[in-house]
């Protein structure tokens, strides 16, 4: 399903100014939950759905309109090829990998039908701090999770060791100077989706001003 652009953007944005409480959206946000990649299965999104998901994902805060991020979509047999190469790298680090860990390394990119790499291209800028650019890439990752959910798929945001090992970057299509913000795994699941503990507001919120 492609995302259509409004014929009259000005009229569309006028509607945003008049937004009302969206109970369905609130209900979704109240239970939004990642699903472990190893619990994912087919089907995953097809190319048209992926493009729709990406169209939604780029609608994030982006100071200076720099778009300091890009995407790499991993699909099909290439995922298994990447897994075999990652296994070789892991065995170079640790020749005594257990059978269980060999399977883990080999299936890093085949647990989910689709994996989307979010690459941070943050760079020094005369006006925009690099930290803000990096946070924009993080916002893209969260938007990807939710856009995938909106299309009926489960999702998870992972990094894992190869996100920080530049020896793996050529294999993954990551250029010199770039960093991995995350690998978003997308698919279906046959497992029950269960809640996990969340922080109590009093532990993470402070207030300044206001009487109510």
List where the protein language model places each region:
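Conserved hydrophobic/aromatic beta-strand scaffold that supports enzyme active sites
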Residues: 28, 115-117, 183-185, 206
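A glycine-rich helix N-cap at a beta->alpha junction
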Residues: 172-196
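Short, charged/polar surface micro-motifs in flexible loops or helix N-caps
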Residues: 77-81, 88, 122-124, 166, ...
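Phosphate/diphosphate-binding glycine-rich loops and adjacent basic-rich segments that engage nucleotide
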Residues: 195-212
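Solvent-exposed alpha-helices and their adjacent loops that cap or buttress functional pockets
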Residues: 63-66, 108-110, 172-177, 197-198
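Small-aliphatic-rich amphipathic alpha-helix that forms the alpha element of a beta-alpha
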Residues: 57, 116, 122-170
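N-terminal amphipathic, basic helical "cap/leader" segment at the start of enzyme domains
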Residues: 2-111, 212
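Short coil/turn connectors at secondary-structure junctions
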Residues: 111-114, 153, 176-180
């Amino acid at each position: 399903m492609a995302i259509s652009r409004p014929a009259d953007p000005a009229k569309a944005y006028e509607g945003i100014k008049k937004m009302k409480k969206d109970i369905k959206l609130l209900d979704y946000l109240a239970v939004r939950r990642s699903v472990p990649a190893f619990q994912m299965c087919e089907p995953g999104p097809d190319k048209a759905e992926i493009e729709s998901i990406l169209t939604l994902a780029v609608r994030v805060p982006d100071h200076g309109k720099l778009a300091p991020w890009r995407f790499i979509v991993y699909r099909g047999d290439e995922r298994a090829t990447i897994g075999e190469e990652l296994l070789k790298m892991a065995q170079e680090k640790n020749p005594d990998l257990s059978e269980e860990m060999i399977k883990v390394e080999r299936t890093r990119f085949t647990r989910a039908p689709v994996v989307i790499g979010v690459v941070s291209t943050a760079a020094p800028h005369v006006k925009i701090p690099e930290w803000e650019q990096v946070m924009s890439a993080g916002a893209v990752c969260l938007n990807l999770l939710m856009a995938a959910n909106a299309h009926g798929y489960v999702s998870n945001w992972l990094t894992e060791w190869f996100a920080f090992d530049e020896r793996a970057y050529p294999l993954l299509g990551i250029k010199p100077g770039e960093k991995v913000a995350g690998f978003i795994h997308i698919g279906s699941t046959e497992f029950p989706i269960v809640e996990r503990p969340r922080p109590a507001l009093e532990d993470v919120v402070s207030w300044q001003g206001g009487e109510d």
